[in-house]
């Protein structure tokens, strides 16, 4: 155990490398993500165990403890139901999954400590984001031109996944990591700001936009536009680029939409589905047999939630309660997905009203301590540009009116708790010094 954290350059470099590898691990897949998370947690506990234990516990930390404790309680409650009714051959399956999910509580405290104590140099994370997202974008271009990417992966009918093969998540990846690239020069290489940034920004934006459009993930593309718009509105240094941004987006999208039938069909299909959802919702025609697939997945949460209104059905049990229990209850086959494709609806069905209230309270506090304090008060956060991309990517990630993957999967949970840990670490006292290089 080391008593001093200020004279450990090798250890600082080690943790900086692990954090810089996060964008790379998301390309490599869940196995590498889990390995990286494991190394961050175990290394932090082995090296800084006593210091982490002594970290000042704030109110938000207590809410995180309560949230994870409630996950365990919900799992235990549901597993007892499964065992007494002889439903699952594997005893306490939900409880085991819930204990494994506890790794994200350890990840939060480990990362928060490393950020708060300035052990990690985030510059290399930003550099990694730049090169990783450029690689994904260029690989998508290659796949679009030659019919397969550099690894030999071929695209689906309407989407180009690049290095992700049959996982259609390239657009989501670019949304999550490419925005950090825009802040690399303004934050870490300020002396080059006036010389190359005006050329650097439009070039990157065009590359990432084309990559997003070809990837075919419509919701990530919309959230990308939404996030960039928020950045230009709230971030003073970017406000003057709003019309440049809008012009570039309009031209790039219009050209690709007009001259590429695959992209046109993909976005036309999305527009058609959204229009149907609006009409069905407005007319309250929820029994319509022609409901879009996404609407059916969203709407499937309601009857499932009614089965366990207050404490939920336990994490990753949505399919069981939606499909098996409702089929038994109604006598009709109920076909369901593994989750309702929305973080909030998933938490509501799997952790009930109590779990959702805890999650919403945590989100509101984080937004207050970061977004509100930076842009609506005289807090010292006003001068901290390092926190800016993390704030708006957090808003994008937890935006309520959008389709999502499962909250409890490796990919989504790792990203979300990483963003949260960095945000809270950066807001702590005496942690507002940025790299002046």
Predicted segments, located by residue:
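Alpha-helical transmembrane segments of multi-pass inner-membrane proteins
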Residues: 20-23, 106-108, 121-155, 165-237, ...
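A membrane-periplasm/extracellular boundary helix in multi-pass inner-membrane enzymes
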Residues: 215, 235-285, 299-307, 315
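Transmembrane signal-anchor hairpin modules in multi-pass inner-membrane enzymes, especially those
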Residues: 1-92, 113-123, 127, 185-199, ...
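Membrane-interface loop/short-helix elements at transmembrane-helix boundaries
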Residues: 162-165, 272-321, 336-346
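A conserved mid-to-late transmembrane alpha helix and its immediate loop/hinge
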Residues: 209, 299, 308-311, 332-370
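Aromatic-anchored transmembrane helix interface
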Residues: 65-66, 85-113, 124-128, 133, ...
């Amino acid at each position: 155990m080391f008593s001093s954290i200020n004279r450990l350059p090798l250890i600082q470099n080690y943790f900086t490398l692990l954090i810089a590898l996060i964008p790379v691990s998301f390309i490599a897949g869940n196995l590498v993500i889990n390995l990286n998370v494991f190394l961050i947690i175990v290394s932090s506990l082995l090296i800084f165990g006593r210091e982490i234990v002594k970290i000042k516990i704030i109110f938000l930390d207590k809410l995180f403890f309560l949230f994870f404790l409630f996950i365990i309680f919900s799992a235990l409650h549901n597993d007892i139901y499964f065992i007494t009714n002889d439903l699952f051959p594997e005893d306490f399956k939900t409880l085991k999954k819930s204990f494994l999910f506890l790794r994200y509580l350890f990840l939060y405290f480990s990362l928060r400590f490393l950020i708060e104590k300035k052990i990690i140099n985030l510059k290399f994370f930003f550099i990694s984001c730049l090169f990783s997202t450029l690689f994904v974008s260029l690989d998508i271009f290659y796949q679009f031109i030659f019919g397969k990417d550099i690894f030999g992966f071929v695209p689906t009918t309407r989407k180009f996944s690049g290095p992700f093969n049959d996982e259609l998540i390239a657009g989501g990846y670019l949304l999550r990591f490419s925005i950090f690239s825009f802040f690399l020069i303004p934050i870490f290489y300020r002396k080059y700001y006036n010389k190359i940034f005006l050329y650097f920004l439009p070039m990157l934006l065009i590359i990432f936009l084309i990559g997003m459009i070809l990837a075919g993930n419509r919701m990530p593309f919309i959230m990308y536009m939404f996030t960039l718009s928020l950045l230009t509105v709230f971030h003073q240094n970017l406000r003057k680029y709003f019309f440049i941004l809008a012009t570039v987006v309009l031209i790039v999208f219009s050209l690709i939409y007009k001259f590429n039938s695959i992209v046109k069909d993909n976005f036309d299909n999305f527009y058609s589905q959204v229009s149907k959802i609006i009409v069905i919702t407005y007319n309250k025609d929820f029994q319509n047999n022609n409901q879009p697939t996404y609407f059916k997945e969203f709407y499937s949460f309601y009857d499932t939630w009614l089965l366990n209104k207050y404490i939920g059905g336990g994490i990753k049990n949505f399919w069981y309660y939606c499909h098996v229990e409702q089929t038994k209850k109604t006598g009709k086959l109920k076909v369901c997905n593994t989750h309702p494709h929305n973080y909030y609806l998933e938490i509501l069905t799997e952790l009930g009203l109590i779990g959702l209230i805890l999650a919403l309270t945590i989100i509101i506090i984080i937004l207050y301590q970061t977004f509100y304090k930076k842009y609506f008060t005289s807090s010292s956060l006003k001068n901290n540009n390092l926190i800016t991309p993390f704030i708006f990517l957090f808003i994008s990630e937890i935006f309520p009116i959008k389709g999502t993957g499962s909250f409890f999967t490796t990919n989504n949970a790792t990203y979300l708790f990483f963003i949260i840990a960095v945000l809270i670490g950066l807001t702590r006292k005496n942690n507002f010094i940025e790299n002046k290089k």
